[in-house]
Amino acid sequence: MLAEGWWSGGATYAGENWNFFGDRQSLLAQLVVTYEDGQQQTVVTSPDTWKYFNQGPVVYGSFFQGEVYDARKEQAIAGWSCPGYEDAAWKPAVEVTLENHVSQVGGGNVPKVNDYSAFHLKAQYGQTVRAIQQLTARSVEEVRPGIFVYDMGQNMVGVPEITLHGMEAGREINLRYAEGKYPDLPRYAGNEGMIMLENIRAAMAQDKYITKGGEETIAPRFTIMAIGMSRLRALTRPCPWKV
C-alpha cells in the first residue's frame, strides 16, 4: 500500500509546506530477492511489469493530517499479496515524471526541490519505525453525547489501536488527537472537557474509519500522532484503546 510519506502532501504541521518532491503518490523501488539456493533476482518498478489498484481501503494517508480508512473495501484487495491472486481489476502502472510538479514551500529555510539532476538515490540506512511500548488509556470520559475523551497519561508519539465489537457496516468513526484538554478558563467557555487543538496549528491530526461490520480493529498505518488526549466520536459506548 502507498501513501504520501515525505514525498508528497503536507510535510509540516504549519500547513505551508506541501509536495517537497512530487505532487502525486509515487513508488520507485528495487527489490532484491534471494532464493534458498543463494541465487538472486532483481525486480525494479516499471510500467511494463507493474500494476496498481486505487480502490483499496486506505482512501487517504498523511503524516500530519491523518488517515481515512474504509474497511468495507478490504474485500477488494483480499489476498493481493499471495500467489494466484486475480488482478483483472488492476491497471497498468504509469510513469510519473518529476518535472513541473506543483509544490508549495513557505518556510524560509526549506529549499524548493525542482532540479533532481544532482540527486543520488540510497537505500534507507536508519532504523525502521517500530513500536517500543504499548500504553492503555488511563481513563475515558463521555464529555458530550457520543463523544469520548481518552486520557493516555502522558504525551507521546504513536498510533492508536481501538477494538470495535458488534458494529454495523458503514458507521463513520472520527478520531482526533491533542496534547491536552482546554483549561477551565472563561475564554474557553463551552469547550469544557474537550481536547485542545489550537496548538497543533494546521495539522488536522484526525483519523476517519468506516466500519465493515462485526468485530474489527482501528489501527492507522500511514500516519503518526502526538497523543496525550484523544477524542473518539460516533459511538454509543467507550471501546478499549491502546497506543
Name each model-derived stretch.
Residues M1-V243:
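Extracellular/oxidizing-compartment recognition motifs
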